[in-house]
Amino acid sequence: MQEESLAASCLELPKDGTDWSMNILKSCKRIYTALLSLVLLLVWSAVAMAAAPDITADAAIVIDEATGQVLYEKNADKREYPASMTKMMTCLLGIQLMPPDAKVTISQAAASTEDLPLHIARGDVLTAEELMRGMMMVSDNGAAVAIAEHIDGSAAVFAERMNEKAQEIGMQSTHFANPNGLTDPNHYSTPHDMARLAQYAMKNPVFRDFVRQKERRVTWIAPSGKSLLAKNTNELLGRYE
């Protein structure tokens, strides 16, 4: 499952002390591949040729993840809905604030959220690690709500924490209204801010490990024996040398 990619980071906007026992990937190329799993991608060949890529996105940015240098931008400071890229912040805070073996119970609010590819149900119990890994691989909206509720009691209070963290890392044009990115007029960001968040998150070795996996069998504590094979929605994992 260890994949390689280009040494650059790409973001496009569409429609600590905890002991984590896991193998952490140290290859920089593989780190950059993991970052690509969080966003829609630009055409790398166009960037390599130093030609302006012909993209249909209303706003986009390409940065060098190591230095933050902007390699390409289009309306990079325009406010847009960040959609599921929001989950980068949710996952990052979850890693920082929850032990990996914390037991997270799925509430009715989480289970009734739209778009649940993990098929979580009210009363299900998973470890924080399993829930976050599953969320980042298949972008489960209910999992994000469950994480928020476990940390702060409600998604609304957790959104306040997200905004505090955003200000801390310099995301000056961002406001979060929920933990999963569902459309809300008060939920917005810019390509520049999302690039800043991704660059910050990728410095966390646990986060990098979460987003680099191509697939994983997510297991439940309850119901006992329940599991689901989650496949990463980033189709470019492993396609670049």
Describe each model-derived feature in a short phrase.
Residues 72-93, 103-105, 126-134:
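Short active-site loop at a secondary-structure junction
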Residues 114-145, 227-241:
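Conserved catalytic neighborhood of penicillin-recognizing serine enzymes
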Residues 105-117, 184, 214-220:
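Acidic helix-start/capping segments at beta-turn-to-alpha-helix junctions
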Residues 33-85, 100-102, 159:
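Beta-lactamase-like hydrolase cores
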Residues 53-57, 155-241:
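Penicillin-recognizing serine hydrolase domain
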Residues 74-80, 115-122, 130-134, 144-153, ...:
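Second-shell loop/turn segments in exported
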Residues 96-109, 205-213:
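Short, well-structured active-site flanking segments
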